[in-house]
C-alpha cells in the first residue's frame, strides 16, 4: 500500500535534527540520516498518526495543558495536513526521519509555535506504538470482512453440492466417498478458527499505549481513559515499559496471518490438483488463470499457485518479528523500527490472497460426473463392506481381512467391489448376500450411512450448512 503523496525527499540537510539538535555538536551524516529514516514505509499510517494526535490534543485541552483555541488550531492544522497527504501535495522529508516528525514539522509550519506544543506529554515511543495498534486494528477489521465474504462463498458453493459425490483421500489415495459440499465445509471450519484467532488477537491489539511516553510515563496530568475513549480503545496499557517496547501483538497477528495463509495454501494445493488433466474435478474460470508463452493449450491456475507460494513469505514475516524481538532489553530500542515492514507485508499478502479467494471460490464449477467416476475407482466402499460384515457378527479385524482379500481380487480383475459378482464375494464370506450391493457397495449408500453430526451424508451436510450460517451471524455480530 502506498499513499498518494509525494515520495520522500532523500536530500538530508547539513544540520542537526530539530528533534535533538541541542545535544549534538555536529550534523548527522547524510547517509546515516537516510539509513535510519523510516518515513519511506511508516507514512502508511498517517491517518492513524493524525487521529492519535487529534485525540492527544483534545485530551491536553481537557486537562488544561492546552487552551481550547490551541486545540482547535492543532485539529484544523492536522485535518489540512491529512487533506494534503491524500491530495498528493504533501512533501515527505527523509531528514525528518519518520511519519510523526514529518507531520509535526508541517503542523508547526502552518500554525506556528502552537504546533510545537502537540508533543507535550508523549514520546515517539508511545506514539508509534499507538499508531501501529490503530493501524493493525483497522486492517484486522478489513481482513475479517474478507474472511466473512470467503466463508459465505464456501457455504453457497457447498449448498449447491450437497449431493455431489467425490472421493475422499488419505495419503492422496482414494479412501472413502464424501460429498463435495462436505469437503468445502472442511475448508469453512479452518477459516472459522482463523476468524476466532484474529478476533481474539484484536482484543490484545486494542489496548492504548499512549500516555506511557518514552518509558516511564509523564509528569503531566493526562487522562488516558479519555484519550482511549476518543480513539476507540477498550482499555489502556497497564505498564509503561511494556507498552512502548513489546510488539507481541504484531507477532500474534503475523502468527494468525500465517495460519490463514497455511489454510489458503492447502486449499490452493487441492485446487491445483483438481484442475489438472489427471483429476478434472473442477474448472476455474479463465479470469483467474493465465496461459503459456510457448504452449498454446495451457491454462495455468496461477492464482492458487501464487497464493501457495505467498504463504512462505508470511511465514518469513512471522520469523522476522520473532527474531527482531528476542534479544531486546527493556524498553524501546531502534531495532523496533524494523517491526513495520514484516507486519505490513503480512497484512498486504493476507488481504490480497483472501480477496482473490473470495472472488474465485463462488465461481468454481465442479465436474460432477468426473468426481463421481473417480469415487468409483480405488475401492472407496471397502470400509462399508467391512462394516456390513461387522453388523452380521464378524469381528472387525476379521472383516478387515476378508475385505482385503476381496479387494485383491478386484485389483487382479481390474474391477471395483461393486463390479464383482455375488458369487465372487461369497467365496470370502457366506454372510455376504444380495443386499450388499444396495446397503454397502454403492456410493450413495456409503455417504448416506454417515448420518451423524460431522458426517458426510447429504442430510448432515445440509444441517451443517444451516448451522454454519448461524455461526457466521454470531461470529460477525
Curated annotation (Swiss-Prot):
GO cellular component terms listed in the entry, alphabetical order: cytosol
Pathway per the UniProt entry: Amino-acid biosynthesis; L-arginine biosynthesis; L-arginine from L-ornithine and carbamoyl phosphate: step 3/3
Annotated catalysed reactions: 2-(N(omega)-L-arginino)succinate = fumarate + L-arginine
UniProt record, GO biological process: arginine biosynthetic process via ornithine; L-arginine biosynthetic process
Cellular localisation: Cytoplasm
EC number per UniProt: 4.3.2.1
Domain of life assignment: Bacteria
Any Pfam family the entry gives: Lyase_1
UniProt GO MF annotations: argininosuccinate lyase activity
PROSITE patterns, alphabetized: FUMARATE_LYASES
InterPro entries for this protein: Arg_succ_lyase_C, Argininosuccinate_lyase, Fumarase/histidase_N, Fumarate_lyase_CS, Fumarate_lyase_fam, Fumarate_lyase_N, L-Aspartase-like
CDD domains cross-referenced by the UniProt entry: Argininosuccinate_lyase (cd01359)
Keywords: Amino-acid biosynthesis, Arginine biosynthesis, Cytoplasm, Lyase
Gene3D superfamilies referenced in this protein's UniProt entry, alphabetically: Fumarase/aspartase (C-terminal domain), Fumarase/aspartase (Central domain), Fumarase/aspartase (N-terminal domain)
Protein family: Belongs to the lyase 1 family. Argininosuccinate lyase subfamily.
PANTHER family reported for this sequence: ARGININOSUCCINATE LYASE (PTHR43814:SF1)
NCBIfam families found in the cross-reference section: argH
Protein name: Argininosuccinate lyase
Amino acid at each position: 500500500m502506498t499513499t498518494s503523496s509525494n515520495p520522500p525527499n532523500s536530500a538530508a540537510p547539513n544540520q542537526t535534527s530539530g528533534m535533538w539538535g541541542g545535544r549534538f555538536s555536529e550534523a548527522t551524516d547524510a547517509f546515516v540520516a537516510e539509513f535510519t529514516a523510516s518515513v519511506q514505509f511508516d507514512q502508511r499510517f498517517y491517518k492513524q498518526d493524525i487521529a492519535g494526535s487529534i485525540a492527544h490534543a483534545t485530551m491536553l485541552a481537557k486537562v488544561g495543558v492546552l487552551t481550547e483555541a490551541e486545540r482547535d488550531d492543532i485539529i484544523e492544522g492536522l485535518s489540512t495536513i491529512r487533506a494534503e497527504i491524500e491530495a498528493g501535495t504533501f512533501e515527505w522529508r527523509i531528514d525528518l526521519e519518520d511519519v510523526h516528525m514529518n507531520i509535526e514539522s508541517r503542523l508547526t509550519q502552518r500554525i506556528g509555535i502552537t504546533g510545537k506544543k502537540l508533543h507535550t506529554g508523549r514520546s515517539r515511543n508511545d506514539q508509534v506504538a499507538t499508531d501501529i495498534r490503530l493501524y493493525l486494528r483497522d486492517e484486522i477489521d478489513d481482513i475479517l470482512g474478507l474472511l466473512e465474504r470467503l466463508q459465505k462463498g464456501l457455504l453457497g458453493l457447498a449448498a449447491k453440492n450437497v449431493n455431489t459425490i467425490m472421493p475422499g483421500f488419505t495419503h492422496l489415495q482414494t479412501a472413502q466417498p464424501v460429498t463435495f459440499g462436505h469437503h468445502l465445509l472442511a475448508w469453512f471450519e479452518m477459516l472459522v478458527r482463523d476468524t476466532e484467532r484474529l478476533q481474539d488477537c484484536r482484543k490484545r491489539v486494542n489496548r492504548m499505549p499512549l500516555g506511557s511516553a518514552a518509558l516511564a510515563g509523564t509528569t503531566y496530568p493526562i487522562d488516558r481513559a479519555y484519550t482511549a475513549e476518543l480513539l476507540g480503545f477498550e482499555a489502556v496499557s497497564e505498564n509503561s515499559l511494556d507498552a512502548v517496547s513489546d510488539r507481541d501483538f504484531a507477532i500474534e497477528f503475523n502468527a494468525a496471518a500465517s495460519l490463514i495463509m497455511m489454510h489458503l495454501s492447502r486449499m490452493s494445493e487441492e485446487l491445483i490438483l483438481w484442475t489438472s488433466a489427471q483429476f478434472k474435478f473442477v474448472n476455474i474460470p479463465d479470469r483467474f488463470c493465465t496461459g503459456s508463452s510457448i504452449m498454446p493449450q495451457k491454462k495455468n491456475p496461477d492464482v492458487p499457485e501464487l497464493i501457495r507460494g505467498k504463504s512462505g513469505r508470511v511465514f518469513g514475516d512471522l520469523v522476522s518479528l520473532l527474531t527482531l524481538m528476542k534479544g531486546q532489553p527493556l524498553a524501546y530500542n531502534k531495532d523496533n523500527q524494523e517491526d513495520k515492514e514484516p507486519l505490513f507485508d503480512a497484512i498486504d499478502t493476507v488481504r490480497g490472497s483472501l480477496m482473490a479467494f473470495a472472488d474465485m471460490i463462488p465461481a468454481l464449477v465442479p465436474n460432477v460426473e468426473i468426481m463421481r467416476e473417480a469415487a468409483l475407482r480405488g475401492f472407496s466402499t471397502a470400509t462399508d463392506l467391512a462394516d456390513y460384515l461387522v453388523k452380521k457378527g464378524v469381528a472387525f479385524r476379521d472383516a478387515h481381512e476378508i475385505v482385503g482379500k476381496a479387494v485383491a481380487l478386484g485389483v487382479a480383475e481390474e474391477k471395483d467391489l461393486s463390479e464383482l459378482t455375488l458369487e465372487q464375494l461369497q467365496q470370502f464370506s457366506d454372510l455376504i448376500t444380495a443386499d450388499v450391493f444396495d446397503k454397502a457397495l454403492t456410493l450413495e449408500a456409503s455417504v448416506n450411512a454417515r448420518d451423524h453430526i460431522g458426517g458426510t451424508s447429504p442430510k448432515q451436510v445440509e444441517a451443517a450448512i444451516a448451522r454454519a450460517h448461524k455461526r457466521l451471524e454470531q461470529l460477525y455480530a
